[in-house]
Regions:
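Short helix/strand-bridging catalytic loops that position acidic/His residues to coordinate divalent metals
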Residues: 88, 132, 168-171
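Membrane-interface interhelical connector segments
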Residues: 122-138
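Active-site-proximal inter-transmembrane loops
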Residues: 83-91
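Hydrophobic cores of alpha-helical transmembrane segments in multi-pass integral membrane proteins
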Residues: 1-82, 94-121, 137-167, 173-237
């Protein structure tokens, strides 16, 4: 069965109460988006850990990343917001589900990449590092998770375009958030291209994953604060 820890993760209950009280899912403010991202990412990792036992000790890296994300969530306003008519769409829900799966896959891929850097460092291995799989195995799973995230990101963009057409009458308007989503998609596509075509080394791949994740954070969660877009109504605040 799934480890019982999944029921004790702190972001879950406030996110659930928030969604219940507002009458909509947790996707209408920075607090709701990031706290639900944290909850889903931790659940995603626990499911991976359940299926792939060698991931048990990777939690020492995944959980700090999750707590940082939750910390940023708590910096946002927890004020309940009404759901605007443009957000009342089944396509939006699909769009959001795949967005959260993308974040989850990226987060665990980054944890695997950090684990690779620690195991590759000249310092002698100690503690949980000795219990992690080899660098080759970590690299392989990081690659798989980025491929998974690339697929979910693709679905996120496609369903977002369908939602935009239903709400505003166009599939693509080069809205800043749309544009930066495309840039992030190209960044992760370049990683897969580099791995498959140019046989990038593990060192290049590891750093690329980490830097790409940082770039995606800026694109999805920081730029909307400075550039007005159709997404700003629910991503900022």
């Amino acid at each position: 069965s799934v480890p019982p820890r999944v029921c004790r993760c702190p972001p879950g209950r406030p996110t659930t109460r928030q969604a219940s009280a507002a009458g909509h899912g947790p996707y209408v403010s920075t607090y709701e988006i990031l706290s639900s991202n944290t909850w889903i990412a931790v659940t995603f990792f626990l499911l991976l850990q359940w299926r792939i036992r060698m991931f048990v000790h990777l939690g020492a890296l995944v959980m700090p990343l999750a707590f940082v994300m939750m910390g940023f969530a708590l910096m946002g306003s927890a004020e309940l917001k009404a759901l605007s008519p443009t957000l009342q769409s089944a396509w939006l829900l699909v769009h959001i589900v795949f967005a959260k799966l993308t974040v989850s896959g990226m987060l665990v891929a980054v944890a695997l990449s950090i684990a690779q850097l620690l195991k590759d460092s000249r310092a002698p291995e100690s503690g949980f590092l000795t219990k992690l799989p080899s660098v080759d195995v970590l690299d392989d799973y990081a690659y798989r998770l980025v491929a998974f995230s690339f697929i979910t990101l693709t679905v996120m963009i496609i369903t977002g375009s369908i939602w935009a057409n239903n709400s505003w009458g166009h599939y693509w308007s080069w809205d800043p958030t749309e544009t930066w989503s495309l840039v992030v998609w190209l960044v992760y596509g370049l990683y897969l291209h580099g791995r498959i075509t140019f046989k990038w080394s593990k060192a290049i791949s590891t750093w690329y994953i980490i830097l790409s994740f940082l770039f995606s954070i800026v694109a999805f969660f920081i730029i909307p604060y400075f550039v007005k877009s159709q997404h700003s109504q629910y991503m900022v605040g």
